[in-house]
Regions:
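Mixed-charge interfacial surface used for oligomerization/domain docking
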Residues: 1-165
Length: 165
């Protein structure tokens, strides 16, 4: 919408979006491994063992592919790890949070999503006090939840478009 309102043509918008796809990353975790087991993305024995031990996989989506982002033990630790991954991304790519569109996404549990959203905003504001640190909060769709389960939770980042002078 910002690009349209600034007078960009459709071709200019598509060219910019294609070039910026590499800046898109999603850092997320799941409530348990049941849906990943059922979908064949993880073995039954290792998945059930991880569920019993409270191990949460950290999943990274970048360049159109899914990668392992490590593991965390317990739900709160998985929130913290996703937040660390976001902060590391910002450090590695420069700028401030205001140079990016940041979104916290949650599945079924809106309260859990709000907790991560508040933690994310607080951490960003502590590290970048001069930045506005806008962070959106959205519910993920059923297309994602069918693969991850209803309690997926994470954050997405994409570079913001700025009109060139």
């Amino acid at each position: 919408v910002a690009m349209r309102d600034a007078g960009c043509t459709l071709d200019e918008a598509v060219t910019w979006l294609e070039a910026e796809k590499a800046t898109n990353n999603i850092f997320f975790t799941v409530g348990n491994l049941d849906y990943l087991i059922k979908g064949g993305r993880i073995g039954k024995v290792s998945g059930r063992a991880a569920n019993l031990l409270g191990i949460k996989p950290m999943i990274l989506f970048k360049d159109g592919e899914i990668f392992s982002g490590g593991v965390a033990r317990g739900r709160q630790k998985s929130f913290e790890k996703a937040l660390d991954q976001l902060m590391n991304y910002l450090d590695a790519n420069g700028g401030t949070p205001d140079d990016y569109r940041l979104i916290v996404g949650y599945g079924y549990d809106e309260e859990e999503g709000k907790r991560l959203w508040l933690q994310t905003r607080a951490a960003l504001r502590a590290k970048y006090p001069a930045a506005a640190c806008e962070v959106g909060l959205l519910q993920i769709g059923c297309t994602i939840a069918v693969h991850t389960g209803p309690y997926a939770l994470g954050m997405g980042v994409m570079r913001r478009w700025k009109k060139q002078q």
